[in-house]
C-alpha cells in the first residue's frame, strides 16, 4: 500500500536518524541566531519533523512554534513545552511576525519546483520581522553523488521492519528515497520521497527576487564560506528594507 511521505516513516524515523548529533546541530542553530538575530524573541521552525532540535532550543526563545507538513511527525514529538502546528512551509497561515525563522534537515529540498521554493521565500518574508533572520540548510549535488551513492539500508524499529533504497538521478537533479515498511503481518507500506538538488546559484537568484539579501552562505555546520565541493550549505537571509 502506497502512503504519503512520513505517514509510516514517522514510526521508524528515530532509527533512520540515530547517528545524527542533534545536540551539536541545535547548538549550531543557536549560534546562528546569536550572530544574526540576537533578540531571541519569537521563533518559527519549519519542517520540525520529530522535534529533536525543537526540544533542545525552544527554552531559549520567548515564544517557539514548531511546524511540519506531516501531522504524523508532529504527533511523535514527546516534549509538550512548545507550540506545534501542521502546515505547508510554502503557504504559511500566520498573521504575526517572528524574529527568527529556520528550517533544518534539508527540508527545503522537498520543494521540487522553483515556484514552490520562491513561494517559501515570499511566505517567510511576510512573517519575518524587518530585523529578523531566516536560516536554512540544503543538500547539494556533491552530497548526492559522493556521500549517498545507490544504497540499501534495512532495520527494525517499534515492531516494524523497513528497507530504504536511495539513489540520485543527475539529469533531473532529483534525489530519491524509497521506503518499504512492514509490520510483520499483512500490512506492507511504500513511501516515496523526492528531493530537488538545486544549483547553489538558484537560491541566490530567488532570494533577491523575493526581497531578501543573502547575509551568509556557510559550509554547513561551520562558519566558513561555502566551497564548490561542499556537501551542504547553510543560508542566512535578511530582508531588504
Q: Model-found features: residue ranges?
A:
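Conserved class I S-adenosyl-L-methionine
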Residues: 1-47
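Class I SAM-dependent methyltransferase SAM/SAH-binding core
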Residues: 50-91
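A short acidic, Gly/Pro-enriched loop at the edge of an enzyme's catalytic core
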Residues: 90-100
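A short SAM/SAH-binding and catalytic strip from SAM-dependent methyltransferases
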Residues: 99-115
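A short glycine-rich, Lys/Arg-flanked "PGG" loop and its adjoining helix->strand segment in the class I
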Residues: 118-130
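SAM-dependent methyltransferase
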Residues: 135-206
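C-terminal lobe and adjacent flexible extensions of AdoMet/dcAdoMet transferase-like proteins
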Residues: 200-241
Amino acid at each position: 500500500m502506497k502512503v504519503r511521505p512520513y505517514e509510516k516513516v514517522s514510526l521508524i524515523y528515530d532509527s533512520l536518524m540515530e547517528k545524527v548529533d542533534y545536540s551539536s546541530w541545535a547548538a549550531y542553530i543557536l549560534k546562528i541566531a546569536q550572530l544574526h538575530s540576537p533578540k531571541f524573541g519569537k521563533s518559527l521552525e519549519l519542517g520540525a519533523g520529530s522535534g529533536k532540535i525543537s526540544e533542545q532550543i525552544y527554552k531559549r526563545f520567548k515564544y517557539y512554534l514548531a511546524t511540519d507538513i506531516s501531522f504524523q511527525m508532529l504527533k511523535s514529538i514527546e516534549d509538550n513545552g512548545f507550540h506545534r502546528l501542521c502546515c505547508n512551509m510554502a503557504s504559511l497561515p500566520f498573521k504575526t511576525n517572528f524574529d527568527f525563522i529556520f528550517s533544518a534537515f534539508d527540508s527545503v529540498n522537498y520543494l521540487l519546483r522553483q515556484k514552490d521554493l520562491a513561494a517559501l521565500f515570499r511566505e517567510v518574508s511576510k512573517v519575518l520581522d524587518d530585523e529578523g533572520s531566516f536560516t536554512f540548510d540544503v543538500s547539494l549535488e556533491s552530497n548526492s553523488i559522493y556521500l549517498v551513492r545507490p544504497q540499501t539500508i534495512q532495520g527494525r524499529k517499534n515492531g516494524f521492519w523497513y528497507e530504504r533504497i536511495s539513489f540520485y538521478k543527475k539529469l533531473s537533479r532529483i534525489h530519491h528515497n524509497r521506503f518499504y515498511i512492514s509490520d510483520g503481518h499483512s500490512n506492507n507500506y511504500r513511501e516515496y520521497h523526492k528531493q530537488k538538488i538545486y544549483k547553489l546559484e538558484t537560491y541566490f537568484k530567488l532570494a533577491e527576487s523575493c526581497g531578501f539579501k543573502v547575509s551568509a552562505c556557510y559550509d554547513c555546520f561551520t562558519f566558513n564560506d561555502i566551497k564548490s565541493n561542499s556537501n551542504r550549505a547553510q543560508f542566512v537571509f535578511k530582508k531588504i528594507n
